[in-house]
Each structure stands twice: as structure tokens, then as C-alpha cells.
Amino acid sequence: MTRIKRGYIARRRRTKLRLFASSFRGAHSRLTRTMTQQRIRALVSAHRDRGKRKRDFRRLWITRINAVIHEMGVFYSYNEFIHNLYTKQLLLNRKILAQIALLNRSCLYTISTEIKN
């Protein structure tokens, strides 16, 4: 029976893995078995946090809008403000409202007084 040499396939796979794990700390960037485990863990975390990022930003936008509304003293709650937006059929999402709240508070004040009436 002739000898079969493994070739470069396994080396190429480990090199690719090593490039992925090169920024990891300690044995996680040196040992092949822990590299594979950390790679799986990193990809799982990345997948989970892509969804979490959306929730976090929405939470941040709501907090900013609520803070500016209370600061202006419109006698509003955030809940009423959003409800009035929907009843008046204004197509402003929370991201846009948060940007307006940061950059142009007087504009948000006029929007809130207009939809309240």
C-alpha cells in the first residue's frame, strides 16, 4: 500500500483559524483546540449582540426623547407623545425624533405642541 501524505489542507485550515484568533488573549490565540472553541464563542456572541444592538439603540432613542420632552415642560409623557404622533399620522420614527431632540429642541417643541392640539 502506498503512503498517503496529508498535504496542506489541515495546515491551511489551522492558518485560517489562527488569523481569526490572532487578537485573542493567552492560549486562546495559540492552541488550536481552544482557538476553535473561542471562535465558536465569538461568533455566537456576535450573532446575539447584533440583535441586542437594535434593542439598545431603541432604548437610547426613547430615553433621549423622554428627557427632552420632560425638560421642555410640555406636560407630556413619552407614551402620550408617541400616541399623538400616530393619531396625527406623522411618519417620524424614534431615531429621527431623537436626532431632532439632540440637534434642534425648538423643532421638537413645535412638533409636540402641534400634535397636542
Swiss-Prot record:
PROSITE patterns: RIBOSOMAL_L20. One of its GO terms (molecular function) is rRNA binding. InterPro entries: Ribosomal_bL20, RIBOSOMAL_L20_CS, Ribosomal_protein_bL20_C. The keyword Ribosomal protein applies. One of its GO terms (cellular component) is chloroplast. Its main location: plastid. Keywords: Chloroplast, Plastid, Ribonucleoprotein, Ribosomal protein, RNA-binding, rRNA-binding. It is found in: Plastid, Chloroplast. CDD domains: Ribosomal_L20 (cd07026). HAMAP family: Ribosomal_bL20. Binds directly to 23S ribosomal RNA and is necessary for the in vitro assembly process of the 50S ribosomal subunit. It is not involved in the protein synthesizing functions of that subunit. NCBIfam families: rplT_bact (TIGR01032). This is Large ribosomal subunit protein bL20c.
